[in-house]
C-alpha cells in the first residue's frame, strides 16, 4: 500500500482490507512499515507492550516469527511497527543487500498466508523500497480531493526503477479512490480524471467518506468490528471481493482452469 502523499487512506485501507479479507476466510498478515505505527494500533496492538517489532527484525535480525502478533479477527495477524523505525534507514545503509531485507524476512513466512499487506509510510525511502522489492503488486490509494495525482508520477517512476533493478515481477494491483463523496463535483471530477489516466487499473470499488470509518481506529478496531453496517465496512468488503476474484482469475488463468466469483 503505497503513495508518497500523506493522508490518502493507506493505513485505513490496509487495516480494513485486511479485516475484510479475513472475513472471507483468507489468512492475512499486515506488516506495519510506517514508524507512526497507526496500522498496529488500529488493529488493537499496544506497541508499548510488545517485545519484537519490524525494527528488531530488520536491524537486530530477530526471528520474524517472534514479531507476529494475533488480532481479534480470526486469521488476521500483524507485524507491528515502532517509532525506532524512523532511524532504521540510516542503520540499514551498512547492511548487505539492504534493499532486500524485508523480502528475505517475509520469504520465511510467505507460505503461511493468503495475503500479506504492507502499510508504507508517505515517503520513498529505503523502507518503502524494501516493501516494493518484497511485493507482488502495489495498491495505490488516491484521495478524491485537490492535488490527488500529486506525487503519483514520482511513485510510478520509483516502481519502474524497482521493477527493472530489484523486482521484475512487481505490478500495479490498482488505483483505489478513497474519501469519495458523490455529492461533490470535485470528487466526481477526480474520479473521472484518475479513470481517464489509468483506465482498467482503477478499482471498481470506491471508498466513501464515512464517519464510522474515521472513528474506528481510535477504538483499535477495523470498521467491520466497530460498525458492520456502515458504508466504510461495506466498501472494504466489496474491495476484498474484487481483489479475491481478480487474483483467483489470475491463478486459474495460469492453471487454465475455471473460476467462481464471490458474490
Name every feature range the model reports, one short phrase each:
Residues 1-263:
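P-loop NTP-binding core
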